[in-house]
Amino acid sequence: MTLLGTALRPAATRVMLLGSGELGKEVAIECQRLGIEVIAVDRYPDAPAMHVAHRSHVINMLDGEALRHVIAVEKPHYIVPEIEAIATDTLRDLEDEGLNVVPCARATQLTMNREGIRRLAAEELGLPTSTYRFADSEASFRDAVAAVGFPCIVKPVMSSSGKGQSFIRSPEQLAQAWKYAQQGGRAGAGRVIVEGVVKFDFEITLLTVSAVDGVYFCAPVGHRQQDGDYRESWQPQQMSELALKRAQEIARHVVLALGGHGLFGVELFVCGDEVIFSEVSPRPHDTGMVTLISQDLSEFALHVRAFLGLPVGAIRQYGPAASAVILPQLTSRNVTFDNVQAAVGAGLQVRFFGKPEIDGARRLGVALATGENVEEAVIRAKKAVSSVIVKE
């Protein structure tokens, strides 16, 4: 039996978000729907989830002592990481002391860097992956590239949104790629992964829920990447029945090996009927924002249900839908959005994240659309994005 208290009362159920971006904001909203007390934590003030939380804190989440202190002050029943850059050793210790880390400390620790999850998938579970090598110096990086061959991709073992990633076609690019990777890591300079290029027809995110009543799969989400970050996503991605079955088998193996209850974003390459594992996030995925319009339970609602120990039962997908990001490039601490009326309508929605400032290119919102097919939905979402005028 799951008992939920009422926010701001002595018996409140408290959820602490570690990372308070746009994904955490939607998780906070789903918690609010259930009367849960929400505490939002991030490294900067006025982060999106802080707007819809009962309280907030600004700390360096890679500082284990600072993390332990804020948890001791707030005494959350559930600790919900939204990002990778967290002192996961501290989370593991706190879990050993009886705290509930979502989905579990092992999952957050293994997936905080690409090395942990790649070794689990390829070496322990025997899942198909790209060829890869790890390196922690420029010399070993060059050796890794020689072993993998050209073309290849280099990524910091801990980064997100394409930061520090390079596509390498020739030896002349190696010095710059190494330098860029060292600048792009979430925790600063360090190890990198060198991956062989996989020939694939498309990429998918298979949103997979590990819940008290079993493992559930959302319809596959297709997406387009640019500069290492997603620009549009759509659901459902058409694929063969055999490929879908293989994708679900891989996702099931991965989430059960990681453990705990929650939603996982499993990233896969698909080529015909073949499926290759890429990465996994033990939390809602940015490409999954399409589920805000495409499903009866969004990825955020599913995550909250799962980690609270509530049954999922079933997931209803309404039909073709898409998301497209609002990604302006400017500098401002007072952003406004004009012509919004052109971005909403029947089967057309928009979300502005409420980020407090922008300096360069930053994702500030997303347009959501339905359509007769995914192609039409993508066109409608992109048109909505182009209609919005972002002002300084």
Swiss-Prot record:
Gene that encodes the chain: purT
GO biological process, one term: 'de novo' IMP biosynthetic process
Protein name per its UniProtKB record: Formate-dependent phosphoribosylglycinamide formyltransferase
EC number annotated for this UniProt entry: 6.3.1.21
Swiss-Prot/TrEMBL catalytic activity: N(1)-(5-phospho-beta-D-ribosyl)glycinamide + formate + ATP = N(2)-formyl-N(1)-(5-phospho-beta-D-ribosyl)glycinamide + ADP + phosphate + H(+)
Organism: Salmonella arizonae (strain ATCC BAA-731 / CDC346-86 / RSK2980)
Domain (ATP-grasp) ranges: 119-308
Residues noted as binding Mg(2+) in the record, renumbered to the chain: 267, 279
Binding of N(1)-(5-phospho-beta-D-ribosyl)glycinamide, residues: 22-23, 82, 286, 355, 362-363
Keywords of this entry: ATP-binding, Ligase, Magnesium, Metal-binding, Nucleotide-binding, Purine biosynthesis
Residues that bind ATP: 114, 155, 160-165, 195-198, 203
Role of this protein: Involved in the de novo purine biosynthesis. Catalyzes the transfer of formate to 5-phospho-ribosyl-glycinamide (GAR), producing 5-phospho-ribosyl-N-formylglycinamide (FGAR). Formate is provided by PurU via hydrolysis of 10-formyl-tetrahydrofolate.
Pathway recorded for this protein: Purine metabolism; IMP biosynthesis via de novo pathway; N(2)-formyl-N(1)-(5-phospho-D-ribosyl)glycinamide from N(1)-(5-phospho-D-ribosyl)glycinamide (formate route): step 1/1
GO terms under cellular component: cytosol
Family the UniProt entry places it in: Belongs to the PurK/PurT family.
Organism domain of life: Bacteria
A matching Pfam family: PurT_C
MF terms (GO), sorted A to Z: ATP binding; magnesium ion binding; phosphoribosylglycinamide formyltransferase 2 activity; phosphoribosylglycinamide formyltransferase activity
